[in-house]
Amino acid sequence: MATSLRGLDAGPGSLRRWILICFAALLLLPPRPNLGYNENYTEPVCGTPWWPDNLEESHHWPWEASLQIEDKHVCGGALIDRSWVVSAAHCIQGNKEYSVMLGSSTLHPNGSSWTLKIPVGDIIIHPKYWGRNFIRSDIALLCLETPVTFNKYVQPICLPEHNFNFKVGTKCWVTGWGQVKQHSSAQLTPAPELWEAEVFIIDNKNCDSIFHKKTLYPQVVPLIRKNMICTTNYGEDLCYGDPGGPLACEIDGRWILAGVFSWEKACATVPNLSVYTRITKYTIWIKDQVSHGAQLGPCRTSWLLLLPWLLQLPVSL
């Protein structure tokens, strides 16, 4: 049997008080613990990962993130602090419920004690994102509902200063669960294990010229802009590899997030070219968003933003 609110003698003042009490209770709830992350605890400096003894066999990318919908991998990402992951804006598919997996190089970790699966509490897409034709400002920030506990399997990558210049020829690494050496007609399914490929930064003008040869756009229309960064490996790259995945470069002993994977030329062609969102063009924006989020507390920001609106609702139901 339905109960009328009128029968509860709830006036405008009391209803607003109840709303405030409910929101206060939600905000005071302790965050859900990240079980399994007390072993090998470290308080890392960004961009200084733990490496296996044999570097020839494999590297270790503790900032690598898998953005998932209903436990299915959709995009890559990079952990930049306890609560924030950087990914590509075009990965966000409307009003979906996302989670982020951290601490594993496989998409199916089988209950590994160091693997985290954390719901995404808030998503911020850059206001100048353009998703048609050649993508622009392809960057998004994912705020985790629960801050992570760092250990040797989960650590952040460094953000570059906004005025840092990644020189042409710089050797970097691209990682992700994308296909490797697959024909363009192959079915696009994620690889079960994390791939890595060594790539080199190339000049934007050279990259732009190569792309123009494959399009009908006139030369006066730039395809590769200043807020993008271009790489090649002349034959071995992450073909159809993870959108949103990190381009990581080791600079003076620290690993720096140079780019976020955005789009690429077909990997059946040579040279293999990949285009990334250039992080230096967005460092200030990222830091502003992270700082603002820290002031609001854990990523229940969507609830907080709704609070003023809820308090203005009419009470006659």
Curated annotation (Swiss-Prot):
Residues 44-291 form the Peptidase S1 domain. It is found in: Secreted. CDD domains: Tryp_SPc. GO terms for cellular component: extracellular region. Residues 1-35 form the signal peptide. It holds the Pfam family Trypsin. GO terms for biological process: proteolysis. GO terms for molecular function: serine-type endopeptidase activity. Keywords: Disulfide bond, Glycoprotein, Secreted, Signal. Disulfide bonds join C75-C91, C172-C249, C207-C230, C239-C267. Its main location: secreted. The keyword Disulfide bond applies. The keyword Secreted applies. PROSITE patterns: TRYPSIN_DOM, TRYPSIN_HIS. Glycans are attached at N40, N110, N272. Belongs to the peptidase S1 family. PANTHER family: TRYPTASE-RELATED. This is Inactive serine protease 45. It comes from Mus musculus.
